[in-house]
Amino acid sequence: YPGIVYFVHGTLFGKLGKKLLLEIVVLVFLTVLYLMDYERVQKTADQVFVTRCGKSTLHLKMIGGILGGLIYSALLLLASYGWFLAKLPLKGLWKVPVSASMMAEPRFGMLNPFVTFWNVNLRSYLLLTLVMFLAIALLAGILAGAGWYCLKNSYLVFLVLSVLLMGLVQAALVHTTTFLDIVLSICNPGVLWITCGAWFMENDLTLSFAGSEFCSLFGCGILILLPYFIGKKRFRKWELM
């Protein structure tokens, strides 16, 4: 399947990958927020959250929501990529390097190969991409939990997070041509969505080092954990009116 004709890499990891990543994040948001907001919706919050033990159950619900979201995400990935590979079998190509000239696709007006920082074949690249998807799903679940701890309303949290993520994607397109670009790229999850399909390879000057995706996961994780712990601490001291 020459890339110039079939666009296997761009379709499998780019077009399809971006859609799946967006669906996974929304799915995890809904799963976590549904469980955490159950008491408020059912009007039993004054009975459950009145004690310290009752408040601690919310943390377990968040964990359950994240685990459920990860399972749903895995099933979504299995069904989507399974359907793709059933229609376009890659038997005999799994050990072909991603940077092979056969995989090259027309990009930026030229026929450019996908030169990765490490020598990975198609199978390894797919596995690394799936790991990235699940890691992002985990961070999305923690972010949803942090949002509920701070706002205590699933509808409001979903609205705020949707606007926030759309803003981060737009902010990722802004460049200052300074060192600040590197910091913003590492701490902005919107960059991971924009560069989906070109992970583990050089994209631009701000992402021209190996492991930039893992640095982005770490940086975003730190920024997400801060409001999570602050919101959780405030929730423990929260008194029902």
Model features per residue range: what roles?
Residues Y1-E39, H59-N153, Q170-A171, N188-E213:
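Secretory targeting signals
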Residues T44, T57-H59:
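Alpha-helical transmembrane segments and their immediate interhelical loop/hinge regions
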Residues V48-K55:
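Short helix-to-coil transition segments within interhelical loops
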Residues L143-L151, G219-M241:
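Junction motif at the cytosolic side of a transmembrane helix
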Residues S154-L168, S185-C187:
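Central hydrophobic cores of alpha-helical transmembrane segments
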